[in-house]
């Protein structure tokens, strides 16, 4: 009897010849060089910087141009050509302004040849079929003729000349250059890995997700800020309030109102009625944007206060609902002496400043007012019903996970909670223990469950999304406490301290990293762990533990540039090994195009193989080998005709 898999293959390859042809094709693919992977993290909504790295293949495209044209072009010419491939539409517009018609036509002829040569060069790892799928449908025939034809053949010389001349004559030269540039961009990196935090304070995480949907192969490892958005769309009131408060703090409420069409009118009105100007809640302004007016600052301050107080009230409710979270030390509103304006914390008394507790009942601090309850309910309904947001987050759920194992690399955003000796810490829920890999698997399942049932709002799965944001054993948070309350109200800086999990000090140790690799059934000798989440401070090394631990926070968030001294890191992994790419802060798209200002500054080889890796040694290769085995089985039962 033929099983379902064999039936599907039999329908696809109905004869022995069809099966034989596919086996030959797949065995040949196994011997192609391993395609290039690129890793980036912590995009934080900074779309222009993200898109620049996508267009440049995280620096891989410029490296290909250098390899191909060094000695043929000057460095200045290579830079100009690179930016034409990065930003073809914009750079073509500048060429039209700078050149006469005859000069432009001559430039087209030179550029066609260079474009086709580069396309050939970046296509060498792929089958013709895969390259064809990356091409614009309107130009497949012409591009393949120019790529695979023998241009040196005297008999065909006039044939190729006529193709290029007619392209120019019919006004299709720009369209061909744009289409070829996009094909090159798609081929220069085969697989993109995004290690968390697409969302946060930046203005356009929505555009980042839209761009990700257009990439041929991408996976996402969720970050702590992504979880807030999953939580809000899954019915978590606390995730919603944290998300909105952070948007207000960084003057980014436009993403809520303008991008996702969620009205904040009632919230703004309520905040204006009950809260006054408060210096602790003034928004953080982006120096690249115009200054806010006094009225704008006041409004945002009021909104942020309203959201913070509702958040602190609900924290009491959820922490009491789940004593197994072991978060009683965060029952902060219930530890306030409202008459004396004192916080009782860790056996100490701390004076409070800039308080805004007028809607807090000292006898029942977790109680929401009727108006607060209504505002939260309305906002939560808007978030869970927003189709555009649901579409974006569904893509991240479908293409994402808490961690990914790919080609002997373990990818996750934050940490694995451990004690000072490196032993996994255990989270106990409903008499079940979760630690190490099991902890990540458990959270992965809970996220999907909550997201798929957004109307179930006061259950464990939904509350665990908030725990992932701030809980002491959250692998995405990685600290003992999130001191938001203290930073708003306690002048004493000792209350602001957030102690990192021991993972972050132990990850420098090779034995510890090899222990983690073994936990995930990876080779302790050849595997790597790739993290995001923590910006690499100036003077610190992102490569640790005998080159097996790599931190690649992309540094997209402008707020961290003063800490890191650079823009951040991305990682390239090709058939020759791994390269860590350092990049400088991205200014603006307009500046990059006008001044041909790239952000890639240095490359550092991390791991170089003695023999070039092949597809057969990759995850894709393993899947192909399985398919070959199935096809060989099918070959024994398939008819000749």
UniProtKB/Swiss-Prot annotation:
Its EC number is 3.1.3.11. Pathway: Carbohydrate biosynthesis; gluconeogenesis. This is Fructose-1,6-bisphosphatase class 3. Its cofactor is Mn(2+). Keywords: Carbohydrate metabolism, Hydrolase, Manganese. It holds the Pfam family FBPase_2. GO terms for molecular function: fructose 1,6-bisphosphate 1-phosphatase activity. It catalyses: beta-D-fructose 1,6-bisphosphate + H2O = beta-D-fructose 6-phosphate + phosphate. InterPro entries: FBPtase_class3 (IPR009164), Metallo-depent_PP-like (IPR029052). GO terms for biological process: gluconeogenesis. It comes from the Bacteria. Belongs to the FBPase class 3 family.
């Amino acid at each position: 009897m033929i099983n379902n898999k064999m039936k599907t293959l039999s329908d696809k390859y109905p004869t022995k010849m069809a099966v034989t042809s596919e086996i030959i094709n797949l065995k040949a693919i196994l011997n192609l060089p391993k395609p290039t992977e690129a890793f980036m993290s912590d995009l934080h909504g900074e779309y222009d910087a993200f898109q620049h790295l996508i267009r440049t293949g995280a620096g891989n495209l410029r490296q290909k141009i250098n390899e191909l044209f060094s000695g043929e072009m000057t460095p200045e010419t290579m830079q100009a050509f690179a930016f034409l491939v990065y930003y073809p539409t914009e750079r073509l517009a500048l060429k039209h302004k700078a050149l006469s018609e005859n000069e432009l036509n001559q430039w087209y002829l030179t550029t066609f040849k260079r474009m086709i040569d580069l396309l050939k060069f970046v296509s060498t790892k792929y089958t013709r079929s895969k390259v064809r799928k990356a091409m614009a449908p309107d130009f497949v025939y012409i591009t393949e003729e120019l790529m695979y034809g023998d241009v040196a053949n005297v008999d065909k010389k006039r044939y190729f000349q006529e193709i290029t001349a007619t392209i120019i004559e019919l006004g299709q030269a720009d369209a061909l250059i744009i289409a070829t540039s996009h094909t090159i961009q798609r081929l220069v990196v085969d697989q993109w890995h995004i290690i968390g935090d697409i969302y946060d304070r930046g203005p356009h995480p929505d555009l980042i997700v839209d761009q990700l949907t257009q990439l041929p192969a991408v996976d996402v490892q969720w970050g702590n800020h992504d979880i807030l958005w999953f939580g809000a769309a899954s019915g978590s009131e606390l995730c919603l309030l944290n998300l909105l408060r952070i948007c207000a703090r960084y003057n980014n409420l436009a993403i809520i109102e303008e991008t996702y069409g969620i009205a904040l009118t009632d919230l703004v009105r309520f905040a204006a009625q009950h809260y006054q100007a408060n210096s602790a809640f003034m928004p953080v302004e982006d120096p690249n944007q115009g200054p806010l007016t006094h009225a704008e600052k006041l409004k945002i301050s009021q909104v942020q206060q309203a959201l913070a107080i509702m958040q602190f009230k609900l924290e009491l409710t959820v922490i009491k609902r789940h004593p197994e979270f072991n978060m009683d030390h965060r029952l902060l509103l219930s530890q306030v002496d409202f008459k004396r304006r004192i916080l009782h914390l860790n056996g100490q008394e701390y004076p409070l400043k800039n308080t805004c507790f007028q809607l807090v009942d000292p006898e029942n601090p977790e109680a929401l007012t009727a108006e607060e309850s209504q505002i939260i309910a309305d906002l939560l309904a808007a978030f869970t019903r927003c189709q555009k947001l649901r579409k974006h987050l569904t893509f991240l759920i479908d293409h994402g996970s808490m961690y990914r194992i790919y080609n002997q690399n373990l990818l996750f955003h934050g940490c694995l909670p451990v004690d000072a000796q490196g032993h996994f810490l255990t989270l106990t829920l409903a008499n079940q223990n979760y630690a190490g890999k099991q902890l990540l698997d458990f959270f992965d399942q809970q996220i999907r469950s909550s997201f798929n049932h957004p109307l179930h709002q006061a259950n464990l799965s939904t509350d665990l999304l908030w725990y992932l944001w701030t809980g002491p054993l959250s692998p995405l948070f990685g600290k003992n406490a999130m001191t938001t309350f203290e930073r708003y109200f306690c002048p004493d800086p000792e209350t602001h301290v957030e102690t990192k999990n021991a993972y972050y000090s132990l990850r420098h140790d090779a034995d510890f990293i090899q222990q983690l690799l073994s936990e995930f059934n990876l080779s302790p000798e050849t595997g790597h762990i790739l993290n995001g989440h923590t910006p690499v401070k100036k003077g610190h090394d992102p490569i640790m533990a005998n080159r097996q631990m790599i931190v690649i926070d992309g540094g997209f968030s402008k707020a961290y540039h003063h800490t890191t001294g650079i823009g951040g890191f991305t990682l390239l992994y090709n058939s020759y090994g791994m390269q860590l790419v350092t990049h400088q802060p991205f200014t603006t798209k307009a500046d990059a195009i006008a001044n041909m200002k790239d952000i890639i500054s240095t490359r550092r080889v991390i791991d170089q193989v003695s023999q070039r890796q092949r597809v057969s040694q990759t995850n894709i290769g393993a899947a192909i080998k399985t398919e070959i085995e199935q096809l060989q089985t099918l070959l024994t039962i398939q008819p000749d005709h």
